[in-house]
Amino acid sequence: AISGMRLHRIVYKGRSDHAASPMQGRRDPAAGFAELAFRMERLWKEGGLPEDFSCTIGELACSPNVGIVVPESVTFTIDIRHVDVPVLEEGWKRIESLVRSVAESRGLDLELVRLSASGGVRTSSEVGEVFRQAAERRGVQPLLLKSGPAHDAASLGGRVPVGLLFAPSIKGLSHCPQEATAPEHLALGAWVLEDALRSLAGGGRP
């Protein structure tokens, strides 16, 4: 299965002050953001979100972004993912409640926009079975995984049977400069894919 995802942009707006201004009475959007980030992670850790639910703050910008100034606004994104769309939407309701609660308690203005949304995609069990058999013929016992990243297959999944074949990244690292896969695993993945495609082309089509 490929996870559904929702991407939101949030802006907390407060009041800009000099860094030497008294702490009392500030309307500091950076402090609001920090509180939200902590509470969102705690919500997941304490079971308020499913264990396989992910929420990520991927972009963050302060304005005016000056070291001696309390920012006037903080803009950030929240990306959420889960394979089950109703679970995804319920999780977002809980996170959105936190977003609004922090803004209200700190006297911050709030802008919230959903930037994108995609539904979860169920991969083809038949294609997966072809992959499994091809891997086992190469002496590998494959693992069945859910995919958090969307992949191009998500765009095709509603029209044709799709499957995903993964080769392991060293230490599980992905989407970072340290991402790497051992050459022998790359070769094995290519062989398994070749075997699977030959099987599908030869009559194993789901």
Listing of model-derived features with the role each one plays in the protein:
Residues 142-192:
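Zn-dependent metallopeptidase/amidohydrolase metal-coordination segment
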Residues 54-65, 76-84, 109-128, 148, ...:
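A short beta-alpha structural unit
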Residues 1-86:
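Midchain, well-structured core segments that form catalytic/ion-binding scaffolds
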Residues 120-138, 163:
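Short, low-order "capping/linker" segments at domain edges
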Residues 91-99:
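Short amphipathic alpha-helices in soluble, non-transmembrane regions
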Residues 7-10, 30-41, 96, 132, ...:
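Predominant activation on well-ordered alpha-helical scaffold segments within soluble catalytic domains
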Residues 42-57, 67, 102-113, 141-146, ...:
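Flexible, glycine/charged-enriched surface loops at secondary-structure junctions
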